[in-house]
Amino acid sequence: MLVSGTGSLLQNIIDNQDDSYRVIKVVADKPCPGINRAQDAGIDTEVVLLGSDRAQWNKDLVAAVGTADVVVSAGFMKILGPEFLASFEGRTINTHPALLPSFPGAHGVRDALAYGVKVTGSTVHFVDAGVDTGRIIAQRAVEIEAEDDEASLHERIKSVERELIVQVLRAANVQDQQLIIEI
């Protein structure tokens, strides 16, 4: 698991572990509450700070993640480089608070509201070299209500996101270093 912030999605993933998946390590790009949540759950943690050499940071990140079958970017706010993506190709997934390919990037909820769409949602997708451009694994829609602002809509999307990521992880299978998900 990769985290950068509060770790609320991470906590949901930890709380819903069963025989289908286990969180074995949490790696962050800075000290953050997500690391504390993992430590409280008895999960191995590591912080890999981004220095001036981004290529070295990616190598250090690969070493920190180790032998994980699946890497989940759960609120991780850094772009993963070629070294990392090559090491975990086809096995790194991300959640996004919009129905991709619409509204990629860090402000998906705000952008959906500004555009005036009536429906947005949550997407789980594979991570590739682009920003939120990887192959879509699963999506779930959330209707935008007249009284929604960015915060209220984001909370409703997070609720759906938490269910969706657990569904995806429970359906995940790794075969020949490739992540297969049958939902």
Predicted regions and their residues:
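One-carbon transfer enzymes
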Residues: 1-183
